[in-house]
Amino acid sequence: MRRVASLAAVVVALTIQPALADDTGAPGDTPAVEGSVMQGADAQGQVYVPADFARYAPRNAYDMLTQVPGFSIRDNDEVRGLGQATGNVLFNGTRPSTKSDDIYTLLTRIPAANVERIEIVDGAGLDIPGLSGQVANLVFRADSFSGQFSWKPQARPHYTDPLLTRGDISVRGRKGTVEYELGLNNDDSSRSGAGGPTVITNGAGEVIERRKDIWNTHQDSPKVSARLTWDPKGDSIAHLGAHYQRKYYHYDEDGYWVAPGLPDRIRTIRETQDTWNYELSGDYQFGLGPGKLKLIGLRRVSHEPYTQEVVLAPVDGSAAVGDRFSQVGDVGETIGRGEYQWPMLGGDWEISGEAAFNTLDNVSRLYSLDPLSGDFVEEPFPEGSGGVSEDRYEAMLSFGRKLTDRLSFQLTGGAEHSTLTQTGMSGLERSFFRPKGSLTLSWTPEQGVDLSLKIKRRVRQLDFYDFLARAFLGDGNNNSGNNELRPQQEWRYEFEGNMSLGKWGSTKVQLVYVDAEDFVDIVPVGAGESVGNIPKAWAAAAVVSATINLDPAGLKGVRIDASVDLETSSLRDPFTGRKRQWSGFQDSYAEVALRHDIPGSDWAWGLNANYAHYQPNYRRNETNRTWEGPVFASVFVENKDVLGMTVRAQLSNAVNARSRRERTVYEGVRGASPVLFHESRDRLIGPIFVFSVRGKF
């Protein structure tokens, strides 16, 4: 099923803090640090140096960047291939060529002592196509050797085992013209769980079954990574990166079901997904003619076995019923990309070409439990196995320049040609040609105010598993597979306005509108249903966020961060013909946070609360709204110098957010047939105790 997160995914939960900074950037007679994107006396933007963050005792670049007033980190979108830049963080004036490491991971590996400065500039004014709005350029150096570590255990009193394995350690340094970085990271680990009652009612509202279910998960994702940078004298620079990762995911659910006229039953669900993946990436940039040429290569491979088993066993000893679904997928991606940049006609030009080859080879099996032998017996399931591949070629040309001292633009245009091939039971080959590009305008009407407008045409990446059939045993659903699935295309319109409030902080307004074609959702396929395309859909969002520094009011060291996100969407339901919102769409979000760094001490404390509301997910015969909340709140206390380390204790879920579900299943098409049953779930999560230790060596 398609999982649609917030349209305003560009807005990350704010944890930013006002700091003292130069609003005018570096003076013209000050040599720019190598890697700077602010060159010359006419450079516009804000510059933050390490002294601006001293009160927070940051351990790494992430700690520093999250304190910049009015700036929210936006990670790179999940795009086809490498494409043009989509995030809003640069590293020494360049964007990373890896797809596996998010911005958070890259920033946390850079010790705060290595950061020279942070430049907040207008993305459209840079010579990197795809950027718009506020962009942070992190200018840093490598020491001869430095290292850092963190450990973030967690404990819950209900249904969940303690988490003791979350943490990371990394080292980086420099030897002559070579910088190196090594890391071991298991931050993407978790222990989760919840338990409580579920009530099943019929169409008349009468209780027909009561359940008590408890579930918990274990997840660990250790990853070892290495990165080399060769930076000789001159205009050449090269990067080489690699990682290897194992992922271990286990889900266990045990339920006791009671229904009139039936023996009590015990239901168990067991899911296992133990995978591995690796990535090799590199780039080399050098001067050529009037400009510079950058060559990029990347190879990713992932082995992804998955098993789900569901058994319903009566306690009176009568025969149990059950099913098992398993699949083994092997995913590969190979990308080659070239970018040539040069100045001409008073602006910056770039021509780029990219070839990307994606593959999936998958084998699925379906079993049912034999009531006599108690063994799982395989059933025919040929539509779940097969291969999917896409060969894609892209060419783009971009041009950007300043129109006035306060107005700049960037124009990008091009197209892609792709061939989608499916093998197996429903083999099919199709080819597509799609134009794409963007126009960005940026205006700074006065100091402390910057506005940007971006219009973008893009093509979304497909999940190759959606081409093949799959069973979802927990709810008794299945996708029949769809060999005619097409990538979603969309026009995206984004407005961003940032205004400095001086010593009081800053505020930001974002407006987003998406006009989508071939929208990906669950649609009728043959006699069943599967992931497919809806001709038209749209969504809109308005986001207002602010950082308020209360130092001028006499509350030294106190700041408040707040954001409100309101969204709406629309499409014509492929089953009912009626208009509705997108499946699983986040239509509202609000967050407020308070942090107090106590002056003259190493102590800090804070509060945070957030609320989110989601639309239901839709299938042919059901609606399903699953959420946690309504409000998540946390409180923390932190000391920034415990034997040279930063130590934090935090209580999360302080106001008892619950795990909820409201699911209605119909006899036929929802809304056009009687209700078969309604499922109402209310499970306890309980408080979460989080502890963290961060240090360096």
Regions found by a protein language model. Give the residues of each.
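N-terminal periplasmic accessory domains that precede
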Residues: A61-M64, I103-L106, G130-P153, T165-G167
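Extracytoplasmic beta-strand/coil segments of soluble accessory domains associated
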Residues: Y62-T98, G123, D127, S132, ...
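C-terminal beta-signal and adjacent terminal beta-strands/loops
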Residues: N639-F697
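Outer-membrane beta-barrel signature, preferentially recognizing the C-terminal barrel domain
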Residues: I269-N277, G329, G386-V388, R430, ...
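Short acidic/polar hinge/loop motifs at secondary-structure boundaries
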Residues: R95-D122, A226
